[in-house]
Amino acid sequence: MLDMTFEQFNSLNFKLYDGNPVIKNPLNSFVIADPSVIEAEYSPDGKLHLFAHGFFGVYHYISDDGFNFHKFAKVAVNAMRPNINYIEGKYYLFYEKTRPVIFNFLSMFGGKWESDIYCIESTDLVNWTEEYPVITHTRDYEDFGKGHAISNPFLTKFGDKYRLYYSCGQTFIEDCGFGEPTHISFAESDNVSRGYISLEKPIISPDESSLHLNLCSGCLKVYHLSDCYIGLQNGIYKRDGKSHSGIVLLKSDDGINFEYIRDFLSPQMCGDNKWMAQYVYACCLSKQGNKLRLYFNARNTSSNVTGRESIGIYEADI
């Protein structure tokens, strides 16, 4: 839980870090995306650990200061959209498990896409267990075309229950040439690693009348404040004939029904740098000393040829 009220959070003055992007796409991938962070106070070595995905799996980065990162290891293959958690002395890394890259590529041309939520565990962020399934296909709303997609895991605790938010389904975004998640739902369990039961219907779906998710829902990250829950959602929307994505701030009393509050971080030019000009995607909120930092990934353009995704920071004093 973040020890602040909604009013306090909403009044914070977030600013983009001047040194963005802090992690650029690697040479073997056009993207580095979906950052998830373990703060130094919860890590075994007193450093900040960040997990993100490229074309060929989930990668582990380490930083002494939260700004300068070096790649440490690849921790999962055929995997994307990680979510790292520290619970009672153990690290749980959830992610979207896909089929091999060639099958993902063929899904763009009518092939079958299949993905589910898997997890690996560690006590030191170095040695990991074998992966195991956590959420698999059980609901019709997870379907699309010939397959199904379950993605963007994000774990929270609600009383005695573990709640794993996830995105599902896929909507093809024409100008990008790839799919983005259609719906957002969650599953609950008494056990952090197994026994999750998904809702019978999603909690967020695309809305043609919305300015923020008229194409599809993207993903949702939920944080517990002292008086409510907030959601940071990056829906996918069409505006001026092009697709875009931006992060919006949502508010909820129960973590199920969310109210739109305001745009939180929108695509924009950063001087002459176009790195976040068209899309701002998934994020992770991290408290570091007297700073609240939002790690996020963004994309310069919808073009499959020149499009690149990198990771940046949006931060505020607290």
PLM regions and their residue ranges:
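Beta-rich carbohydrate-recognition and catalytic domains
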Residues: 1-148, 156-213, 223-276, 287-318
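Active-site lining segments of carbohydrate-active enzymes
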Residues: 153
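A carbohydrate-recognition surface predominantly in extracellular/luminal proteins
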Residues: 218
